[in-house]
Amino acid sequence: MERRTFLKLAALVPGLALAGCGGSKTLLSPKDPTMLSIWHVYGEQADSPMNRLLTEFNDTVGREKGILLNVTNMTNSAAIGGQLQDAKAGKPGALDLPDLFSAHPSDASALGIETLVNWNDWFTAEDMAAYVPGFVQDGIIEGRQVVFPVSKSTQLIFLNGSQYARFAADTGAQLSTLATWDGFFEMAAAYRQWSQGKPFCALDYPLRLVELNALEQGSGELYKDCWYDLTNEVFRASWMEFARGLVQGDILVSDLYSNTQVMTGETLAGLGSSAAILYYNDFVTYPDNTTEPTDLLLAPLPHAAGTTTPLMPQAGVGLCAFQTTDQKAEAAAVFLRWFTEQQRNLEFAADTGYMPVSSAAFDAIADYPFEQQSYQRLYDVYNEMRIQNTPLSEPGIVGYHAKAKALYDSLRQLQKDYPQRLADGETLEALAEETWQLLCDNA
């Protein structure tokens, strides 16, 4: 109750947090440590790279300055927005609101940017110039830096290399075919035929792929009234291309994260966040309990054939803090400086599969001694995409993620029945049209 009352007060008194980047006197004291609760999305296991860094901070800089960070929720980027809203509303069973938390810009907007720390009060323009400009810009809402960049991701294709080797040997398939969506769907159909009905690829964020394909074909503005412009014919055509693949069983909507389907042999490939590499195991375990090395392969995101404007999605949460006290805001700023220091930011990115946000760290990737070959492959693909493509941020639409989740949940249910419905005589176009109507119903 006290926390929600303070947040209301902070909204009414924007000057409650004093500018800290120019102040010389600290509010922190090792004799009376400032406690910060934190929610994050970097691995839900206790020994995640983020948790190891938090322990290191508490034992070093935190102890020296009087800051103690305590993880009170480890979750994922798809769920954290709803969990924050439940906590803010005080719903039964909800956790207490954290001081510091991972969030998409749309999550920050939904919470109310007036309740959040403006990091520009604690970091100078010179400080922020050390970070990749596009990543910084992502976190600015209505002129306030409310989301601080700590890591970014894109999307790419992960493949079970052992299974792919057999498929390629029998069919002559080549990874270069995946450079375009035409080639992607051609390979998907060939794999379904070769595997006697198995889908080729599980997609984590189909809507984002449809968007990018449409934009590369000159669709123009896609959004209207907090959803999509359903009169945009290029967007509709892009959706229908993916819908036909879904109905035929060439692709499917993943069970939240596609690594699960790849690791169990349900699909040959998964298309999702580059940071998913953290969850790919060294061995694939098939339904009959046989195993074989994953030998993980990676391929860049496909593009529309002939596009002159290749795009790469730029995603990932940053860190936000609720406005409570200047002491807590200063403590959070101290942690962020430490966390995003060049070498540490590079090592964290290398451990988790994210792109670093420090410009110097990004430039140093090429010389980083990766322990696993799959991570070296990942950053090779990152560099290839970075050179050839234009980054594009996620749509910052309040309520977008909830609508997308509802659509994906519906498609997961429908995709189970599509093979039988096709066999029973329903047409491919009619079933693909059914998926379009689902998207329209979410408006």
Residue ranges and their predicted role:
Residues P287-P356, A360:
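Extracytoplasmic/periplasmic substrate-recognition and gating elements
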Residues R63-G134, R166-D170, L268-A269, P287-T290:
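Extracytoplasmic "Venus flytrap"/periplasmic binding protein-like
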Residues S102-L156, D182-F185, P293-P302:
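Hinge/lid segment of periplasmic solute-binding proteins
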Residues E142-V150, Q155, D182-Y228:
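Extracytoplasmic/periplasmic solute-binding protein
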Residues F185-A189, D225-L256, L297, L301:
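Glycine-centered hinge/linker elements that transmit conformational signals in sensory
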Residues S359-A366, F370-Q373, N383-A443:
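Conserved C-terminal helix/tail region of periplasmic/extracytoplasmic solute-binding proteins
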